[in-house]
Design a protein with these regions (language model features):
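Interdomain motor-coupling "hinge/lid" segment immediately C-terminal to the ATP-binding subdomain
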Residues: 121, 126-230
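Short glycine-rich substrate-engagement loop in P-loop NTPases that contacts/grips substrate
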Residues: 54-84
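Conserved lysine of the Walker
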Residues: 31
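Hydrophobic positions on the alpha1 helix immediately C-terminal to the Walker A/P-loop
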Residues: 34, 38
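Accessory nucleic acid-recognition modules appended to NTPase machines
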Residues: 183-343
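Catalytic cores of nucleic-acid endonucleases
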Residues: 326, 350-395
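Pre-Walker A adenine-sensing motif
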Residues: 2-16
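Hydrophobic anchor at the beta1->P-loop junction of P-loop NTPases
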Residues: 23
Length: 404
């Protein structure tokens, strides 16, 4: 089991506190394993496993606990038979209707430490925010980074050079369970295809009561094909009209929002760096795991420049950056990244194969006058840094702990 220390280091300060620890992220990205890691650390610190109550609400053994009242009664009964603090671990809690009422009740009436996971971003909206009133901390969990993938893939192919490992990562992506399949091509594709279908059906169609599944599938296919490129709901509506599917831009935006809430896609807004304002249209979208894109739709190597962008974007999120696409005049910077008052700029390219490409990628920073770090990241093996702008091979960039 990989330790996922980047997440554990953030969660650890809150272990044992009254704050509810909420872990969200796309289905099967490793949230359940984090619950196990937390239990391991608690046990190592002297807490008896007899004080743990763990429930995975997708397990049929707990199908009778699908309402707040049923869950409340079960936990109160079990906690009454236990001594000392109770540690509650609820996996995929969105399956329980009105679950937030339970969590708040436990927090108030029990001496407990609560951890919950869910596969939808709306887990923390509306009702929960009202009931908990700021008494929770959220951790968004992502599929494996290249560094995490490398650690596990090397257990399967210990002598594989890092270049070959990265080629595998470009196609396989970072879903943790692939390690159990030893990253074999056909089983991995089947698993990712089935996972995609599960996210689409359970977390998007079923949750949002979507009737026009064909329309949803067309929108998802379009967004995935256009990962990392700017487009508007209006342009997508025109495309669908060409396929004899007339649909309002508002409907398209709703369907894309449902996909983002299920963590299938991430939206990146565009920012005018000179006017210091967020632009209202033509956002970019990236997929939660590029391996899903390859398994379901193919084309990762054909669209490698976009896939490299996708990989870098997810790595920026993992490290806690808020990310926008930057515009300065007629130039665009792939990622403008902010965290605790610090800023970082990242430009992603496939290969700097010509002077024209070099000029375009490095020239994106011509209008940026501050002294924050600026990177151009590509697959090139040799360093082409210039004018204070750092050039890095993408593998080295992803494996570097400190970019500042």
């Amino acid at each position: 089991m990989i330790k996922r220390e980047r997440y554990m280091s953030r969660i650890r300060p809150f272990i044992g506190t009254e704050l509810v620890k909420v872990m969200t992220g796309i289905r099967r990205c490793g949230k359940s394993v984090l619950l196990e890691l937390i239990q391991q650390e608690l046990t190592q610190s002297g807490v008896s496993p007899a004080q743990f109550i763990s429930i995975n609400f997708e397990d049929m053994r707990y199908s009778h606990l699908q309402t707040a009242q049923a869950l409340h009664d079960e936990i109160i009964k079990r906690a009454a038979a236990m001594e000392g603090k109770v540690y509650l671990f609820f996996d995929e809690i969105q399956e329980v209707r009105d679950w937030e009422k339970c969590v708040n009740s436990f927090r108030v009436s029990l001496d407990c430490d609560i951890y919950v996971t869910g596969s939808n971003a709306t887990l923390l909206s509306g009702e929960l925010a009202t009931y908990l009133g700021g008494r929770y901390v959220e951790f968004v969990i992502y599929p494996f980074s290249f560094g995490e993938f490398l650690e596990l893939y090397r257990s399967v192919e210990p002598d594989e050079p890092v270049q070959k490992c990265f080629q595998k990562y470009l196609l396989a992506g970072g879903m943790p369970y692939l390690a159990n399949l030893r990253y074999a091509d056909a089983p991995s594709r089947q698993y990712l295809h089935d996972l995609f279908n599960s996210v689409q059906l359970k977390d998007i169609v079923k949750r949002n009561k979507i009737r026009d599944v064909d329309l949803l599938e067309r929108i998802i296919a379009y967004v995935i094909a256009n990962v990392g490129t700017t487009f508007s709901a209006t342009s997508l509506a025109k495309f669908l009209k060409s396929e004899q599917r007339a649909v309002a831009p508002e409907t398209i935006l709703n369907y894309i929002r449902y996909c983002c809430e299920a963590y299938l896609f991430y939206q990146v807004r565009r920012e005018d760096l000179q006017g210091k304002q967020i632009l209202a249209s033509n956002e970019k979208y990236y997929i939660a795991d590029h391996g899903i894109r390859e398994a379901v739709f193919g084309g990762n190597m054909r669209d490698i420049n976009l896939i490299l962008e996708n990989i870098v974007y997810l790595e920026l999120l993992r490290r806690g950056y808020e990310v926008t696409v930057g515009r300065t005049g007629d130039k665009e910077i792939d990622f403008v990244c902010g965290k605790r008052g610090e800023k970082l700029y990242v430009q992603v390219a496939y290969l700097l194969a010509s002077e024209e490409t070099v000029s375009r990628e490095f020239g994106a920073y011509d209008n940026i006058r501050d002294n924050f770090p600026k990177y151009v990241v590509s697959l090139d093996e040799f360093d082409m840094s210039r004018n204070g702008i750092k050039h890095r091979n993408i593998r080295d960039f992803l494996l570097t702990e400190d970019w500042t």
